Amino acid sequence: MKIKWNSEQIPKMNVKNNKDVTFLTYPAYEEMNWLVHGFSTRFGGVSRGIYSSMNLSFTRGDDESCVKENYRRISDAMGFDMNSIVTSDQTHTNNVRKVTEKDRGKGIVIPRDYTDTDGMITNVPGLVLATFYADCVPLYFADPVNHAIELSHSGWRGTVQKIGAVTIEKMSEEYGSNPKDLKVAIGPSICQECYEVSEDVIEEFEKVFDKKYRNRLFYRKENGKYQLNLWMANKIIFLEAGIPEENISMPNLCTCCNPEFLFSHRASHGKRGNLGAFLGIRS
């Protein structure tokens, strides 16, 4: 299958295939051998129909046994134990939760006992954080000095609430992370050319982003709608929080441009499964 990349940016994400499961990785994160990480695609699972085939959502109507088998396969392919996963409870907040050993397996093999969690941080070896997508923006964070990690889910609401900056502050508070040391990545998600929004959404961005950024964030069309750039918005948030530009990996891969390769809510009109972002510290 031909993948549509959104730029000629080098390096692109790596497309991996292991044990008949296709997933994506970041070159910058592969250089940190203390990490395990990846981003799933639609390929390598057992789900059928609109969920075909690597659906990672238990809540969209897919057969639970298929979803569990998909988790077993993606975990095996990426190189970690399925029972070590800790999942988010995404409700478009900027809430970031510290994950500890007692959370191991929550959302996969045991029920979650927390809600409204769009970001998770940890420094516990052997745990793997997981967040879920079908156009919204995955944010990866790694601190190579303190060996701490974080994953955040940032749709337009999370971006307006600057969950990226909240995450960096939380990592600093909990683990002493310095923004200058962090290696961050923006994951596959909807690109500006695919993301049409109404004026009320743009008004929310105008409230929290300086005027000097507006030409980089959105433009107005003749129909009164706007095209919004969530990738650039999150990059600006990172830069303003003190992340060096060379430490930011951009996605250059749009979910909506690649609906046969990645799940996209917009491209499928809501008839879809979920992709997964995974990030863990090796034991």
Name these PLM-found stretches:
Residues 1-283:
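Active-site microenvironment for binding and transforming phosphate-containing groups
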